Amino acid sequence: MPYEHQQIEQKWQKFWDDNQTFATSDTTDKPKYYAVDMFPYPSGQGLHVGHPEGYTATDIMSRFKRAKGFNVLHPMGWDAFGLPAEQYAMKTGHNPADFTSQNIDHFREQIKSLGLSYDWNREINTTDPSYYKWTQWIFEKLYEKGLAYESNMMVNWDPIDRVVLANEEVIDGKSERSGNKVERKALRQWVLKITAYADRLVDDLDDLDWPEAIKEQQRNWIGRSKGAAVFFNVDHADAKIEVYTTRPDTLFGATYMVLAPEHELVDSIVTAEQKQAVADYRAAIAAKSDLERTDLNKDKTGVFTGAYGINPINGEKLPIWIADYVLASYGTGAIMAVPAHDDRDFEFAKKFDLAIKPVIAGGENDDVAYTGDGVHINSDFLDGLDKATAIDQAIDWLEAHQAGHAQTNFRLRDWIFSRQRYWGEPIPVIHWEDGTTSLVPENELPLLLPHATELRPSGSGESPLANLTDWLEVTRDDGVKGRRETNTMPQWAGSSWYFLRYIDPHNDHQLADPEKLKYWMNVDLYVGGAEHAVLHLLYARFWHKFLYDLGVVPTKEPFQKLVNQGMILGANHEKMSKSKGNVVNPDDIVREYGADTLRVYEMFMGPLTQSKPWSEEGITGSRRWLDRVWRLLIDDEGQLRDHVTTVNPGDLDKIYHQTVKKVTDDLENMRFNTAISQMMVFVNDAYKSDALPVTYMNGFIQLLAPFAPHLAEELWVRLGNRESISYVSWPTYDDTKLVDDTVEIIFQVNGKVRGKATVARDINQDDMITAAKADDNVQNFITGKTVRKVIAIPGKFVNIVVS
């Protein structure tokens, strides 16, 4: 009887559903294990074969930990707000909720077909009002603590359609949808003060079991640096420019200054002669994104303001320019330029014929900036000093002369939290006509997103919610009129805390029960793509730390261990994409080969964290191996083979116990590919055996179960077991069976190998010597000669010295 994967997989998926096999209890004395996948955005395309890789990894660990006696929480949900659903709705005239619901149903069906052991009773959906009630509640707490504020921020603006565009909707400076040229425009936004947590977000990375590359990306994104704030008076003006620099020791080398075109002082310091040039330049760069402006490879542009700053350390006048490579949102929006020792400043100075003054010894080429270390030159009281000493003395001088002070800075900017979109969590704020702002009362949460069938831009830059006047306009008891906030939250909001809601998803009175949070947190294993290294992971850590400060959660960090699965590439080693025609649909694989085959193949392709190309040969090879496992135990009539027996002749002892040890060790370290390799070795040896001890077959099927759960459940029952394999205790190994009872020793005559033999491991020296002298080849070299000496090392060799 062949291995009928469709019948077997449907049977056991129904069994797991009917019996709530993977429902998790909160009341147990077992140790806990909490495994979370980065939950998916339910797109219209459905799953691709990259999704099951990470999901299978967490599922294997969850099944393994259950068998090891842990109480496992392994949930799934949907990050379901997002731009694509709104774009689809605007094209079709449908509400995005309907489209999203259909997509979720499709995703759920696909995921269930993979045999993943999720507790579906804990399923969450970020668009569910019972969920986003608590997203809104967190926002209100941030607002109450002064961590949510309003500010005018630059956005992408389509001046024809009069709509704000997300960065991904702007292609080559034009709207992807309309083709109109995009401008940059200041618009009122809600902002979260993530910078208040910058130090803790850096320092606490040291306590996490995360890939070092991810931690380094977060450190770089936060960009903590120590330096100095330096104040430059503007010549002949009542104005002062503050600059932050990590190298105050190079002040003597500053030869010009640059302000961001949007800097608040530009209008007040620009001279009449330069006013038009400055205005023209600002207009020319208005549509550029921050990314375009700071591209290191682009041609440097800028305009002189006509004004000069006074270098506080030597009194020199420095021309003040504006240039797009300086951003108003970064630092103070102003820099002091030291072109002799900074590549970008050097290129700018060369293009505009500005002075270049070396202050660090070591540069030998006038055609490039010298960015290395060296002693200071041309720097007055800093001459001859090394970098560290010079920095300290420069800061001391600035502070003594009230021209600056030591300062720690961060590259991290506050989080622009609002979106001019319909399909997002409503921000629970009301703006009153008397100029005040208030939160929606907590007992009135959730503030529901109103149903709308026609989504069209407001024309004002506000979201389509501005068109829904019945929802928008409110009146207080005292007759004061107000408007609800029309911005909605970004998709990052719901994903910043969802792992907490899994713990208590049906609680109407709290975000989650404190005792349950105390039991389950932290997340023991968090698996997802490295593309979320910064934004999602940083935002989730920020919110978690804030909730910790409120006393809502018991831990400082949400995710103790993070694993990034590698990308599954097309067969040609390129990223899978519809345009390249190399996307593999997992539904097709499950239908033709089975979910267990897909699971085994994706884990066998290579180390989990490495990118790997898809291979049709590989998937068929994995299927052939599962067929071999089936045929090892089941005959052509579908019966258990006769040589599966209660008798153990001992020939599989070593390989079985080696396999249990190897697979167990590999699972603890998530080395799934080598665990499968070891199981393949065991199957090969089992095929050579005349008798298959049922205890060893049971143990092997338990090892296989996390990888191929449907097949394992079926074979487990056919081996005579009654309960589901899911909670059966993990097999153990016997250390004494891991080594051979015999050992190979070599026989030497005068130090040259003349023979070898397999002997008992505990053989004594006398018996070793007897065996050596009895060896036919050894006898050829010692017969007729005098034995001078015999050296015998137990378990190693015998050396007979003759003459």
Curated annotation (Swiss-Prot):
It is an enzyme of class 6 (ligase). Transmembrane segments: none annotated. Keywords: Aminoacyl-tRNA synthetase, ATP-binding, Cytoplasm, Ligase, Nucleotide-binding, Protein biosynthesis. It holds the Pfam family tRNA-synt_1_2. GO terms for biological process: leucyl-tRNA aminoacylation. Gene3D superfamilies: 3.10.20.590, HUPs (3.40.50.620), Isoleucyl-tRNA Synthetase, Domain 1 (1.10.730.10). A motif ('HIGH' region) lies at residues 40-51. GO terms for cellular component: cytosol. It catalyses: tRNA(Leu) + L-leucine + ATP = L-leucyl-tRNA(Leu) + AMP + diphosphate. Its EC number is 6.1.1.4. A motif ('KMSKS' region) lies at residues 575-579. Belongs to the class-I aminoacyl-tRNA synthetase family. This is Leucine--tRNA ligase. It comes from Leuconostoc citreum (strain KM20). The gene is leuS.
